[in-house]
């Protein structure tokens, strides 16, 4: 079973049955440094890079104007994210019917919840494609935090913690039926909302 920062702090009993598709023996839960320094504040369609900047950007709620799933739900296998709601920016929404790599700027926010009846997210997972070539996940930025535990993941796809907690699973998005829980899933993105 995959042990990760989400499973440690958000309802691990529900997580047990949902992680078989994305296994990793690395149980790291530490945070990498503030990736990229966080100097870019982002904009309404692009999250910034760096934990402090992403935290402030999420608090602004600007992503709630994106293409969001209508309700909180149990995560789709093989996700380890327990209970969530995904919001995709226009880059993903406008290219969801495609089959090639996502354009630069593709981004999503996954609100993480402790239960399907919770009304406030207990954490967030954010990803952003930073270059045209995904380079096996190296050119994707990932951020993950839990309200109770602070930032757990913050860095590019080759960062050791990011690789064990995010990239190792997201690499399989769209690769086969088990890793395509939503139409259009591919190139690091499992659930393109449009």
Residue ranges and their predicted role:
Residues 21-23, 67-69, 86-88, 167-170:
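Sequence contexts marking disulfide-bonded cysteines in secreted/extracellular proteins
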Residues 23-28, 32, 51, 56, ...:
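Sequence context surrounding c-type heme c attachment/ligation sites in exported
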Residues 18-45:
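Ser/Thr-rich, Pro/Gly/Ala-heavy low-complexity intrinsically disordered linkers and tails
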């Amino acid at each position: 079973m995959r042990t990760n920062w989400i499973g440690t702090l958000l309802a691990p009993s529900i997580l047990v049955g949902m992680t078989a598709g994305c296994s990793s023996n690395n149980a790291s839960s530490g945070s990498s440094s503030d990736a990229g320094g966080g100097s870019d504040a982002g904009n309404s369609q692009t999250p910034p890079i760096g934990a402090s900047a992403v935290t402030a950007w999420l608090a602004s709620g600007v992503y709630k104007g994106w293409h969001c799933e209508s309700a909180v739900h149990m995560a789709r296998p093989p996700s380890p994210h327990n209970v969530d709601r995904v919001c995709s920016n226009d880059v993903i929404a406008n290219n969801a019917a495609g089959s090639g790599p996502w354009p630069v700027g593709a981004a999503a926010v996954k609100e993480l919840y402790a239960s399907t009846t919770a009304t406030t997210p207990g954490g967030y997972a954010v990803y952003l494609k930073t270059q045209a070539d995904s380079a096996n996940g190296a050119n994707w930025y990932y951020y993950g935090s839990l309200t109770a535990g602070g930032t757990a993941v913050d860095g590019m796809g080759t960062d050791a913690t990011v690789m064990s907690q995010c990239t190792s699973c997201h690499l399989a998005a769209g690769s086969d039926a088990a890793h395509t829980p939503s139409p259009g899933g591919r190139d690091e993105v499992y659930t393109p909302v449009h």
